[in-house]
UniProtKB/Swiss-Prot annotation:
ATP-binding in keyword set: yes
Helicase ATP-binding domain boundaries: 25-412
Disulfides per UniProt: none
Coiled coil: none
PANTHER family given in the database record: UVRABC SYSTEM PROTEIN B (PTHR24029:SF0)
Subcellular location per the Swiss-Prot or TrEMBL entry: Cytoplasm
Domain-related comment: The beta-hairpin motif is involved in DNA binding.
Biological source species: Nostoc sp. (strain PCC 7120 / SAG 25.82 / UTEX 2576)
CDD domains with a match to the protein in the record: DEXHc_UvrB (cd17916), SF2_C_UvrB (cd18790)
Protein name: UvrABC system protein B
GO molecular function: ATP binding; ATP hydrolysis activity; DNA binding; excinuclease ABC activity
Top-level taxon of origin: Bacteria
Length: 665
């Protein structure tokens, strides 16, 4: 059995060894919940990696958005180059859920664009969980949504090994039954082709091709093939071909499901007719009968997920199977930035049910559609074996449930101490701030400014520009790729000051920032709560001259607590440095690390976004262009079908640009 092998150019220092030892002891002692309360820049990810190595169990790392999930995945892949570090996030490039607006009698059909590469990464994650134990899956909150039954998925896998006697036609039938399609012209994920005694399969979980060579009815060779060059990568003794989709329904189960759906329809129709809702009764009858016809004929229909309760054989109200059910019983959960992620877990179910309730009431869906849902918070926690909450500012619930198992990590390996905090009056604050900014610019350092409103951020940005400051404004309308590029430009010195509202808190690794200015710090609320203030102040905690200025005329409870906590940590850090003779050292970190790595991932995952293609066409790797052209051509044809000719023309122009780039014009 392969074990985790942590590889890092440094060893645990400061209070990392103590934190690692305490967490390992707590988990091995059978404790269910523990918290790593780690200050910004103390190497929390490295400590967690060391714990994972020592515990040696399959681990789910949960982040609250795709950006942080990708950063964590990149870091953990560097720490564990020889282990399976997987990425599991929502595979939608675009998603408009099905909805009904009664006031205007408007029905909005579900529309979605699935990202093929993310789908492959999701399949890769579940495959790794079936085949090995040295697995870390970094996921977003989408992992609590239904994912098909693990037992059925595993049961449907097709085992192949050298020397196995099997008729080639049987394998072709099996492949078709697990959603692979035959295409003898063009290979790809979820496809297979036959050339005489050679069968080639494009697995759903990777971009290599599996070639199976037959000698009569016996498997003679199994090889991995490069999909572009056709060269043999390596030979295999055996391989499992997992289904092309996570939702696998055996034929016998499908028959029973159709009967159950028909019975529910009969009951629901009668119920609606009894209450005088004749339009709704006719609507549900017509829509469900059409779906049943499709299910019986082809085993699939649009919105099939709404029948997942029947297809999986679950009882009403039972939780759906999710990614968590693919883990073994002794799995470990790590929740990053838990003060944000834990409330997300609580909120997903309620938002989903509110939309479904309207669809059910107006005859668009059967009541069982409500069971196609994310896990409720209590269902999620029931499935958790053991958990580590990770945050610089854990929520009250995490601290309470962890009891006395709160492990503090305050010392930075670099010896850098928490920022010095000063509170200044609002009168003359802009001129005061301008002077501070100019001092930082002279030292080639960066500044973050956080305001309470979008209007103030815009006005402040304009004022600073008028005074010759190179400044950018980060607002909510900027997409994740542009956001990462702006942060990248800040680190590289393309500009010196970044102004924002609520976009400067968790997960920003910006060692060049020496000053954080918080405007209206005394305006109590979510953006100026104790945890938000500590997180924002922490953005300057990676710089040896880190400072935070709070502009306020009154001292709020949140300000007092945030300042006291920061001063407490500073005291511990200063004492440690003095005791060990440590001189704080600046963090030397290439700007191409986590942020740039994610930027590259993002471009690949979102390359079918026209704006992204246009902005980055010169930077696209040549090997990715053919695949991108295929995707854009499919979008162009779809746009033409919908009579969206302007959109189709834009896509055509982008395709021409890409083809010109490919031939070197």
């Amino acid at each position: 059995m392969t074990e985790f092998g942590l590889q890092a150019p440094f060893s645990p220092t400061g209070d990392q060894p103590s934190a690692i030892a305490q967490l390992v002891a707590s988990i091995e002692g059978g404790n269910r919940y523990q918290t790593l309360l780690g200050a910004t820049g103390t190497g929390k990810t490295f400590s967690i990696a060391a714990v994972i190595e020592k515990i040696g169990r399959p681990t789910l790392v949960l982040a609250h958005n795709k950006t942080l999930a990708a950063q964590l995945c990149n870091e953990l892949r560097e720490f564990f180059p020889n282990n399976a570090v997987e990425y599991f996030v929502s595979y939608y490039d675009y998603y408009q859920p099905e909805a009904y607006i009664p006031v205007t009698d408007t029905y909005i059909e579900k529309t979605a664009a699935i990202n093929d590469e993310i789908d492959m990464l999701r399949h890769s994650a579940t495959r790794s969980l079936f085949e090995r134990r040295d697995v870390i899956v970094v996921a977003s909150i989408s992992c609590i949504y239904g994912l098909g039954i693990p037992a059925e998925y595993l049961k449907a896998a097709i085992p192949l090994q050298i020397g196995m006697e099997v008729n080639q036609r049987e394998i072709l039938r099996d492949l078709a039954s697990v959603q692979y399609s035959r295409n003898d012209v063009e290979m790809g994920r979820g496809r297979f082709r036959v050339r005489g005694d050679v069968l080639e399969i494009g697995p759903a979980y990777e971009d290599r091709i599996i070639r199976v060579e037959f000698f009569g009815d016996e498997i003679d060779a199994i090889r991995y093939i490069d999909p572009v060059t056709g060269e043999i990568i390596n030979s295999l003794q055996a391989v499992n071909i997992y289904p092309a989709r996570h939702f696998v329904t055996p034929e016998e189960r499908l028959e029973v499901a159709c009967e159950d759906i028909a019975y529910e329809l009969k009951q629901r129709k009668a119920e609606l007719e009894e209450t005088g809702k004749l339009v709704e009764a006719q609507r549900i009858d017509q829509r469900t009968r059409y779906d049943l016809e499709m299910l019986r004929e082809v085993g699939y229909c649009n919105g099939v997920e709404n029948y997942s309760r029947h297809l999986a054989g679950r009882q009403a109200g039972e939780p759906p199977e999710s990614l968590i059910d693919y883990f073994p019983k002794d799995w470990l959960l790590v929740i990053d930035e838990s003060h944000v992620t834990v409330p997300q877990i609580r909120g997903m179910y309620n938002g989903d049910q509110a939309r479904k309730k309207v669809l059910i009431e107006h005859g668009f869906r059967l009541p069982s559609a409500a069971d196609n849902r994310p896990l409720k918070a209590e269902e999620f926690w029931q499935k958790v074996n053991q958990c580590i909450f990770v945050s610089a500012t854990p929520g009250n619930w995490e601290l309470e449930i962890s009891e006395n198992r709160i492990v503090e990590q305050v010392i930075r390996p670099t010896g850098v101490i928490d920022p010095e905090i000063s509170v200044r009056p609002t009168e003359g604050q802009i001129d005061d701030l301008l002077g501070e900014i100019k001092d930082r610019i002279d030292l080639h350092e960066r500044v973050l400014i956080t305001t309470l409103t979008k209007r103030m951020a815009e006005d402040l940005t304009e004022y600073l520009q008028e005074h010759g400051v190179k400044v950018r404004y980060l607002h909510s309308e900027i997409n994740s790729i542009q956001r990462i590029e702006i942060l990248q430009d800040l680190r590289q010195g393309s500009f010196d000051v970044l102004v924002g509202v609520n976009l400067l808190r968790e997960g920003l690794d910006l060692p060049e920032v020496s000053l954080v200015a918080i405007m209206d710090a005394d305006k109590e609320g979510f953006l100026r709560a104790e945890r938000s203030l500590i997180q924002t102040i922490g953005r300057a905690a990676r710089h040896i001259r880190g400072q935070a200025i709070l502009y306020a005329d009154n001292m709020t409870d949140s300000m007092i607590k945030a300042i006291e906590e920061t001063d407490r940590r500073r005291g511990i850090q200063v004492a440690y440095n003095k005791l060990h003779g440590i001189t704080p050292q600046p963090i030397v970190k290439k700007s191409s690390n986590a942020i740039l790595s994610f930027l590259e991932v993002s471009r690949r995952l979102n390359a079918t976004d026209l704006k992204v293609v246009e902005e980055h066409i010169d930077e696209l790797p040549l090997e990715e262009i053919p695949n991108l052209i295929d995707k854009l051509e499919a979008q162009m044809k779809e746009a033409s079908k919908k009579l969206e000719f302007e959109e189709a023309a834009k896509l055509r122009d982008r395709i021409k640009q890409l083809r010109d780039k490919l031939v070197g014009r």
